[in-house]
Amino acid sequence: MKQYHDLLKHVLEQGAQKGDRTGTGTKSVFGYQMRFDLSEGFPMVTTKKLHLKSIIYELLWFLKGDTNIEYLKENGVRIWNEWADDNGDLGPVYGHQWRNWNGEEIDQIKEIVHSLKHNPNSRRMLVSAWNPSVLPDTSVSFSENVANGKAALPPCHAFFQFYVADGKLSCQLYQRSADIFLGVPFNIASYALLTMMMAQVCGYEAGDFIHTFGDAHIYSNHMEQVELQLSREPRQLPIMKINPEVKDIFDFKFEDFTLEDYDPHPGIKAKVAI
């Protein structure tokens, strides 16, 4: 994952010191892009161990259109716990916008599948999670926003677009805000997997995953962890195997995915900025 290490180095060397909503402080750059050829292996960071279970279940949760953390908790995934209200609700976050835009019957994922199958040259194959009408009020708590019909958090990975050429499906993600140490490795793997899933159900080979950033930052309390990670040598990328029998994007289950030859360095703990 040279691309990811290059991003870390770029921010350390070129980043500006900036404050942020959480009060933690960051080193940040504005505008950066990485590209991953999915035929060269699954882009799962190897210089620290990632929790694949969380990545897969979160993606399946998005695709279900779910916005309550109960499904995640039932499957041992805790990455959204800090932002949910007492009932486990997060308000109209990613899954709601993907599957039920603005509370209307606009299923962006179904529309993408239809376009990929029937109009693959379309330049309108985008999914947006950025909905200004439900952005949270930063002056109140996460739970108050949810009670007011707003999202607990605004989407960081805001929208993505698909592109078909030469029988291959590629995806580009625009991420407006990126916690490079903790969040970005998850985001890379999640959208690479989504691209592979879409390719399978729509009859394409997986092409490239392109990851474009707005504000890409390293939190000030992650600097030691980043230096440790950069001291490690990246290892060969693993291979993601997907059950070839699944032909509907909404039919995937956790058991349909097998990651082979993943040999990462040990995990590196760090605090999430809340």
UniProtKB/Swiss-Prot annotation:
Xref: SUPFAM superfamilies: Thymidylate synthase/dCMP hydroxymethylase
Compartmental location: Cytoplasm
Residues reported to bind (6R)-5,10-methylene-5,6,7,8-tetrahydrofolate: H51, D179, A273
Enzyme class: transferase
Catalytic reaction list: dUMP + (6R)-5,10-methylene-5,6,7,8-tetrahydrofolate = 7,8-dihydrofolate + dTMP
Pathway: Pyrimidine metabolism; dTTP biosynthesis
Keywords: Cytoplasm, Methyltransferase, Nucleotide biosynthesis, Transferase
List of residues binding dUMP: R21, R123, R124, R176, S177, A178, D179, N187, H217, I218, Y219
Matching InterPro entries: Thymidate_synth/dCMP_Mease, Thymidate_synth/dCMP_Mease_dom, Thymidate_synth/dCMP_Mease_sf, Thymidylate_synthase
Function field: Catalyzes the reductive methylation of 2'-deoxyuridine-5'-monophosphate (dUMP) to 2'-deoxythymidine-5'-monophosphate (dTMP) while utilizing 5,10-methylenetetrahydrofolate (mTHF) as the methyl donor and reductant in the reaction, yielding dihydrofolate (DHF) as a by-product. This enzymatic reaction provides an intracellular de novo source of dTMP, an essential precursor for DNA biosynthesis.
Family assignment from sequence similarity: Belongs to the thymidylate synthase family. Bacterial-type ThyA subfamily.
PANTHER family: THYMIDYLATE SYNTHASE, THYMIDYLATE SYNTHASE 1
Self-association state and partner proteins as the record states: Homodimer.
Protein name, entry field: Thymidylate synthase
Gene name in the database record: thyA
